[in-house]
């Protein structure tokens, strides 16, 4: 009987440790989540997807060094108009970020487009989030309309995702489960 209880407790301990090992929400002494850059943030979320939840993606910007398939990619921030055109990030706010990354549906960007942005100053999160929402909601869409836009903050990072409602909801859920600090700032249907 003692051996059985010890075996049971050992299995329980092993399972508990394995579950804790899947959490990536490590924080520094100030309570901020430790994230190296926007690409790492998106990669961590993308890697939390089960294989049957994933879809074909092309990521990064159109430069040879940043263009990626099947994984999040770095998006250059030097061309503010390209940030706006491809990700919906307002060109006027490009000077407020120092790092960006993206994930886009390979067949149609309106099906799923996600951008992650590191803000130079965390105090700008609310104003940039409002500008981003206004910029995406005010677009003229071609090749189909996205269903939904979600903007999420994570310390000094902003993440925006728009597209098919099911894909957007899955991403939002994965991000908020992976990073306990994540806060949904806005969640709107696109009309």
What are the language-model segments listed below?
Residues 21-113, 119-191:
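Soluble, non-membrane globular domain cores that form compact, hydrophobic packing
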Residues 11-12:
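Repetitive helical segments and hydrophobic/amphipathic motifs
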Residues 1-8:
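Bacterial N-terminal signal peptides that target proteins for export
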Residues 15-19:
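C-terminal motif of bacterial Sec signal peptides marking the signal peptidase cleavage site
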């Amino acid at each position: 009987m003692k051996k059985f209880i010890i075996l049971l407790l050992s299995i329980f301990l092993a399972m508990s440790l394995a579950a804790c090992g899947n959490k990536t929400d490590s924080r520094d002494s100030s309570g901020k989540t430790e994230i190296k850059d926007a690409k790492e943030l998106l990669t961590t979320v993308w890697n939390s997807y089960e294989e049957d939840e994933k879809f074909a993606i092309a990521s990064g910007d159109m430069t040879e060094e940043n263009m990626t398939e099947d994984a999040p990619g770095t998006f250059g921030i030097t061309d503010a108009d390209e940030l706006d055109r491809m990700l919906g990030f307002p060109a006027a706010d490009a000077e407020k970020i120092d790092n960006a990354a993206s994930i886009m549906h390979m067949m149609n960007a309106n099906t799923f487009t996600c951008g992650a942005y590191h803000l130079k100053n965390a105090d700008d999160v609310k104003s940039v989030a409002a500008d981003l929402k206004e910029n995406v909601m005010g677009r003229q869409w071609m090749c189909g309309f996205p269903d939904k836009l979600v903007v999420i903050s994570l310390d000094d990072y902003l993440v925006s995702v728009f597209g098919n409602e099911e894909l957007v909801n899955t991403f939002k859920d994965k991000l908020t489960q992976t990073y306990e600090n994540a806060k949904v700032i806005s969640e709107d249907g696109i009309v």
